[in-house]
Amino acid sequence: MGKKPITSAQVRTLRNNVKNKPLQELLLNLGVDLMLRSSDLLNLKVSDVVSDSGKVKSEVKVKQKKTGKTTLNIPLSKNSINSIKKHLLGRELDSYIFVGNKSHYTKSPITQKQYSRIVKSWMSSLGVEDVNNYSTHSVRKTKSSEIFKQTQNVEVCRRLLGHANITATSQYLGLEDSDALEVARNINL
């Protein structure tokens, strides 16, 4: 099944835990909302979420590095919009969103390894025993897993994740025959 998604309850707790940590707040909120692979998320620039006129965009569209496809216009939640207003307005539009403490030297985004360490520290702060069940992919899976749980619509998840086919999305979400049978049991005609 791969890495576990972060649950809605865990996200709410984490949002409270990171509210005074700009980098982590932005990673959590934008990571959950945009459902991007870490390579695409970390390479976002301020101009991807803030317009030339200095207003926060309500939707974000990104060209995915792995597939070369452009995502749908993914809506930003109030949490992401507030994080952007709080931490990014006034920054140069061509600067990376996710820069670490040494950014004034490198101007580069944090690495995937740094992001992975942050995710594991989040899970550790929640008291999760085996943090190795979580990774940056857990953040990408979080919203799509919740969408599937609420709608049972794999096609919607496929489109949002930018997968080429439903088989990949089913595997990604960890769906098995037992899940299909459970849905069938719950539908009475």
State where each predicted segment sits.
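Conserved catalytic core of the tyrosine transesterase superfamily
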Residues: 1-189
